Regions:
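ATPase catalytic-site recognition across NTP-hydrolyzing enzymes
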Residues: 1-38
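Short, structured patches in soluble enzyme cores that scaffold and shape functional sites
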Residues: 2, 13-14, 50, 62-64
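Short, well-ordered loop/turn elements at secondary-structure boundaries
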Residues: 28-30, 40-43, 96-98, 142
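A conserved active-site cap/scaffold subdomain adjacent to cofactor or substrate pockets
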Residues: 30-49, 58-64
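Mg2+-dependent endonuclease catalytic cores in nucleic-acid-processing enzymes, primarily RNase H-like
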Residues: 47, 54-184, 203-204, 213-243
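Short helix-capping/linker segments at secondary-structure and domain boundaries
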Residues: 199-208
Length: 243
């Protein structure tokens, strides 16, 4: 696609080969994220991923796309659960883990229904300063801070083709792909990515303190020396006690 002054994420065309990957290695420890842009007439798109703390990258592993009569609360919850169990799998624990955070746009009724009926908790994202939030996504794309698995066809198509409307307040309606396999709509997958970038906690370290220590039945671990308290440090200083 041709990049114009109205292209929402122009950096993607230059970085696509580095961003879109066919294989993803999941870290031993990670914070999982789920982001949802809700549409009933438009598409509902849910993104699944994790923040790779060691490499400082947001990794999108899968997507879920629904709309029309199939878009019921029960069906949405069922499919989200299936994707979470498949994609948010901790190899260290050999089991799926609950996401650190689920977020969606401000559909408070759906948020309440998912929590009440399915024990599935979403936080409502802020949606102000949209252009500033898009600029943040552009920077992350430019810096290679986002990885997307190639199975996320709608997300890739929407990022690549999204165009601003004349007021730069929203996106122009996007035609479906030539084969009809990928729905265009209002680039809802891009909105879900914007929510994700806005809400990811880059500062949180998901690794336990003893992650790099040797473990096993034949490994002896000496007791950890307790750190001196501030009071003890002061006494040691006064008494000129050397450690």
């Amino acid at each position: 696609p041709r990049t114009t002054e109205n292209t929402v994420i122009p950096e993607f065309s230059l970085m696509k080969d580095k961003i879109v990957v066919d294989e993803i290695e999941t870290p031993h420890h990670f914070d999982g994220y789920v982001s949802c842009d809700v549409g009933f007439r438009d598409l509902t798109v849910v993104l699944f991923g994790f923040y790779d703390f060691m490499n400082a990258q947001l990794v999108i592993t899968d997507e879920l796309v629904m709309n029309g009569p199939e878009m019921t609360t029960d069906e949405l919850a069922k499919r989200i659960k299936q994707k979470e169990e498949l994609r948010l799998f901790n190899t260290e624990l050999n089991m799926p883990v609950a996401p650190y955070l689920r977020i969606m746009d401000n559909d408070l009724k759906l948020i309440n229904d998912l929590a009440r009926l399915h024990n599935m908790y979403f936080a409502a994202t802020k949606k102000d300063n949209k252009e500033a939030q898009i600029n943040q996504v552009r920077l992350w794309v430019q810096q290679g801070k986002i990885k997307i698995h190639e199975r996320c066809k709608h997300l890739i198509y929407h990022i690549e083709n999204a165009q601003w409307d004349k007021n730069r307040k929203g996106f122009l309606h996007l035609k479906d792909s030539l084969t009809g396999e990928i729905r265009g709509g209002h680039c809802d997958a891009l909105d879900a990515l914007i929510y994700l970038v806005r809400n990811v906690n880059e500062a949180r370290n998901p690794f336990p303190e003893d992650f790099n220590e040797m473990k096993g039945p034949n490994v002896f671990k000496s007791p950890t020396k307790r750190k001196d308290s501030k009071l003890q440090e002061l006494v040691n200083t006064i008494m000129n006690i050397k450690k």
